[in-house]
Amino acid sequence: MSEVKHLEINYKTDELFEAFREFGNKDLYMVEELQGQMIDASSESPFYGIFHGENLVARMALLKKGDVEEIYFPEFDDYLLLWKLEVLDNYKNKGYGQSLIDYAKSYNMPIKAIARQNSKEFLMNQDFEDVHAKNPEGHDVLVWAPK
């Protein structure tokens, strides 16, 4: 498994995200999320990533209940939201996405994920279940619960 690192909220992380803005998918940029976190310097960073050498090649935001509005997860008192997981194209199919998911699961808390950019099949292969609901942007909502 690749090492997942906690990314701090600072301009260095903004620079690391640059490759994702250049080569990644617009729906997954996380520009607003990072800028919002930089404004609120007291908040803990929700960003995690995997490096290949000096380059950030995979990333995700992992939010806690209360960080975002919640309507799809009423049966759980506490949970995480897996937000905008992305692996750069040249690094896909090398286990980086799996490593990020495994890291999120290591908290042993239920996880809600929004299936963006054809990620539904990937998430279902990671034991997430389709709750047959869509978020306001029309993306499928999936959940994972520890056994």
From Swiss-Prot:
Entry's Gene Ontology molecular function annotations: acyltransferase activity, transferring groups other than amino-acyl groups
Ranges of residues in domain N-acetyltransferase: 7-147
EC number per UniProt: 2.3.1.-
Alphabetic keyword roster: Acyltransferase, Transferase
Source taxon at top rank: Bacteria
InterPro entries: Acyl_CoA_acyltransferase, YlbP
HAMAP family: Acetyltransf_YlbP
NCBIfam families: PRK13688.1
Official protein name in the record: Uncharacterized N-acetyltransferase SH1739
UniProt organism field: Staphylococcus haemolyticus (strain JCSC1435)
